[in-house]
Amino acid sequence: MAETVLLIGTRKGLWIGRSADDRKSWSIEGPQLPMEEVAAVGVDPRGGGNRTDGAQPGHDGVTPRLFAGSTNFAYGTRVLHSDDLGHSWQGVPEDAIRFPERTGNSLNRVWQITPGIQPGEVWAGVEPSAVFRSTDGGVTFTMNDALWDHPHRETWEPGFGGQAVHTVLPHPDDPEDALIAMSTGGCYRTTDGGRSWAPRSTGIRADFNPEGKKYPEFGQCVHKVARDAADPDLLFAQNHGGVFRTKDGGAHWDSIEPGLPATFGFPVLTDPRKPGTVLVFPLVADVERFPPDGAMKVWRSPDSGDTWEPLTAGLPQDGMYSAVMRDAACVDAGDPTGIYFGTRSGTVYASRDGGDSFTEVAANLPDVLSVRAATLG
């Protein structure tokens, strides 16, 4: 029977959920990293340092390597990894993910940790907006110079959460190709292994711009982007205002918000077992930022955003005013797909049937910032 490990990063530490019965019941452990803000958690299913056969990190490991990007407001920001499913954590060297002196900047937060497709490759999106890449399984990282030196940099402005790269999506088949998203700045894509980056936000709305300039080439406040399971050129973006779809890898985007109760939100997910299935978490905005009508509903589209349906089974439908942050939702590799999300009021919900029903697996935690699941067996 499949086991699942759920990483739950919060404003004040890391909690770990464990299920040994195909996600029917859960135990919650923590806090780990107490009083550290864990804005990013990640899973590399290829494994890491647990190998004993001489293979390097990232080479088809038996146990997934888990990651946490944490910020201690006294000691700074760091990346940790675990090769025993979160029972213990190892910090990388202090200078393993640091800005070069020439930038005049220091690392504020790690917002995204995700594996690439090359052996040992791990990507990190950080604040201020930059991308770091590791080739040794996430032990050491190197800043991408081309993005840091991009001529658009002086136009990128901080959103409410800071000026950061929060999404890194390596292409599943092409090691030279990756798409990133930042707030604010929009989406950028490299097709030459990071030697150059081109804006890929045409068609995404920037409501905060004056009339006549609401559809710029770059500069949008994109909140999150997800890639389709079957078509790598099909991506979905939850924007500061609106939900958008591209069928050409980001060259052009179209609105898919008709049918949703609100256009604001933070996360967007795709189902790895159902191509064309996308999920969002709408909020009324810009002033309130509450779930519409005080009811927690996940909205799912089975047809790439052409139509939408609310998912409510097991979720509170009255007096619910807590938001789901951009990285506080994820899917797993189970069958059927598991869907997980945590709220700013510290409650975590899980579905083991692709979103048809949810159960509460944790409550009364600090506000949840990041969630990732590792499936075993």
Per-region residue spans from a language model:
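Extracellular glycan-interacting surfaces
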Residues: M1-G377
